[in-house]
Amino acid sequence: IREEQPYQEISEHDTPKPNTAYGKSKLEAERYLDSIGNNFPYIILRPTGVYGPREKDYFLMAQSIKQHVDFAVGFKRQDITFVYVQDVVQAVFLALDHGMNGRKYFLSDGEVYQSAAFSDLIKKELGNPRMLRIKAPVWVLRIVTFFGEYLGRMTGKMSALNNDKYNILKQRNWRCDIEPAMDELGYHPHYPLERGVKLAIKWYKDNGWL
C-alpha cells in the first residue's frame, strides 16, 4: 500500500493488502469480527515492527551484526517504523479503557527511520564491532528465500529466509498513522528506538542469547 514516493502514511481507511500468510490470517480475523457487527464488542490493534525481549527476528539481526555482517535488501528508499513491546502493552490497556468499538488502531513509536537505523543502534549497543554492510538487489533475496522455503518444506523446519520474509523485506513503505490511537486512546509511545534497542540488546545479553 502507498508504495509510490513520496511515501504517505497508511491509515485504517486504506484497503489492507497483506502479502504474507501471517498478515492474511490477521486480515481474515478482522473481517470475521467486522461481519459479527455490534453484537460483539472488539477493538483491533495494528502494531508495526514489534521488537523487544524474546523477539527472534530482530535477534537474528543482532546475532549477524555481532558476527560482523549486516545484510540489507534493495536500493530504493525504505521508510521503516517500529514499536517497542512495552508500548504495545500500554496500548492494549488503553484500548480496553478508552477504545471505540470496531475501530482499528495503528501503533508505532511515532517516528520514521531509514533501513540502516536499527542495525546502527544494535552495532552501538554491541560495542561497535567491525561490520560489513552488504546491500543486495531484491532479486537476490527472491532466489535465497525461494530455496529457503523449499528446504523448509523438505525438512519440515521453517527457514528464517522464506517467502513471507521476502515479501516483508521488499516492502518500501512502513509509515502508518498513529494519530487515532493518540487522540482516542491517549496512547503516547515512551520508547524511542534508541532506548528500546538498548533494552532489547541488554535482555539478549543478560539471558545468554548474545
Question: Where are the model-predicted features located?
Answer:
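Conserved sequence/active-site signature of Rossmann-fold short-chain dehydrogenase/reductase
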Residues: 1, 50-52, 88
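Catalytic helix-loop patch of NAD(P)-dependent Rossmann-fold dehydrogenases
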Residues: 4-50, 70-74
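A short C-terminal helix-loop "cap" of Rossmann-like NAD(P)-dependent dehydrogenase/epimerase domains
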Residues: 12-15, 62-73, 128, 154-160, ...
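Residue-level signal for the nucleotide or nucleotide-sugar donor/cofactor binding architecture
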Residues: 20, 80-86, 113, 176, ...
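Substrate-positioning beta->alpha
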Residues: 24, 28-29, 55-60, 73-96, ...
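Conserved C-terminal active-site "lid" loop/helix of NAD(P)H-dependent oxidoreductases
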Residues: 85, 120, 145-188
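Mid/C-terminal beta-alpha module of Rossmann-like enzyme folds, strongest
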Residues: 95-161, 194, 198-201
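Amphipathic terminal alpha-helices
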Residues: 176-184, 188-210
